[in-house]
Amino acid sequence: RRQFLAKAAGEPHDFTAAFDELRRGVDLSLNLAYNEPWGQMQPVRHILGALLFEQGHIEEAEEVYRADIKLWKDNMWGLLGLKLCLEARGDAPEELAEVTKLFNERSSRADIVPAKTCFCAQDALAKSCCD
């Protein structure tokens, strides 16, 4: 529901309300009961990070991805987001190399290696596997 509200709130140039809905969605997702298969189709944190990154909020996107990696140790999606943030910053080559190595290991068995942490990002499909 929060993802839907965020999409509905996303005006062409002001994503403040959309980001607020996604942040609330992240908070709510932390209290979901554990189940397998996972009850979320798309983790809200991955959506928030991708859209923050896309809108140039690199530092906050990086915080989102670091929190995701802390919660779900070295997961491919969190590592991808952190890798993109570190590439954009360009000031941490050693950490970028380490994160890239981990991402490559974690994504080595994926059918499709994603370019973004959410295909909802505007340029996610432009750089996809299927071009």
Language model features with spans:
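Structural motif corresponding to the intra-repeat A-B loop/turn of tetratricopeptide repeats
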Residues: 5, 12, 55, 89-90
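"A position-specific structural signal for the A-helix of alpha-solenoid helical repeats
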Residues: 2-4, 47, 81-84
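Single-residue signature of alpha-solenoid repeat helices
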Residues: 18, 61, 95-96
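Terminal, low-structured helical/coil segments at or just beyond the last alpha-helical repeat
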Residues: 93-131
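Amphipathic alpha-helical segments of tetratricopeptide repeats
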Residues: 23-31, 67-70, 104-108
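TPR-repeat structural position
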Residues: 15, 58, 75, 92-93
